[in-house]
A protein has these predicted regions:
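Membrane-spanning alpha-helical segments of multipass transporters and channels
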Residues: 1-207
């Protein structure tokens, strides 16, 4: 057990992933998950996916730098492991960006955004960020292990306060799986979208 210096160390592990998730949503409002120009080339699905993900991740790195700089130097948040906090926060940003890229690519811009907002609402109530998940209704306790923000909160709580045990490495493994799995699905979807059909060449008219 590690000692927290104040409320900041207690609430930061919840609000930092929340900010990163919302930041990822805004990023994909500004950028195309699958660039149209890349889809029109013979590039593989992975290259098309990375053509969308890399610029988004660059914005994610900038967001992490600004966010951690503000909470540490501006608000005085104590970081027991600065390197660990930076590295883990970058992993969280990558996982959230890849997950949202995948949802938007697979479901489409409109349905994808609805799914992202629904996922955000579920994670706010079930991640155990502000109070123990054991005190929440049974539904939220049941979905807690299946939502990425649960592991983002747990991992950040450990690297910020200095408690490094198996839960941190489980969180790293799960978020890495989310990031790589999402990128793989997006690459598959990009490959499918490069196959032109009559419906895509001649879309139905809506009056």
């Amino acid at each position: 057990m590690s000692r927290a210096e104040g409320f900041g160390e207690g609430f930061a592990p919840f609000f930092l992933p929340l900010a990163l998730f919302v930041g990822a949503l805004i990023t994909w409002l500004l950028l195309r998950p699958l660039p149209t120009r890349a889809l029109a080339t013979p590039a593989s699905g992975w290259r098309v996916t990375l053509a969308g993900f890399v610029p988004a991740m660059a914005l994610g790195v900038a967001q992490v730098a600004v966010m951690l700089g503000v909470v540490h130097y501006g608000l005085g948040l104590h970081l027991s492991s600065a390197v660990g906090t930076i590295g883990f926060t970058l992993l969280v940003a990558a996982a959230f960006l890849a997950l949202q890229q995948m949802l938007t690519a697979v479901l489409g811009p409109a349905a994808g955004k609805v799914a992202i907002l629904a996922l955000l609402m579920l994670q706010l109530a079930s991640s155990g960020g502000t109070y123990p998940v054991e005190t929440t209704p049974a539904f939220f306790r049941a979905i807690n292990p299946f939502l990425p923000m649960s592991y983002a909160v747990t991992g950040l709580r450990q690297v910020i306060t200095g408690t490094l045990d198996a839960r941190l490495w489980v969180s790293v493994a799960v978020l890495t799986f989310v990031a790589l799995g999402s990128l793989t699905i997006t690459a598959w979807r990009a490959g499918r979208m490069r196959t032109w059909t009559l419906d895509r060449l001649h879309p139905a008219l809506a009056i």
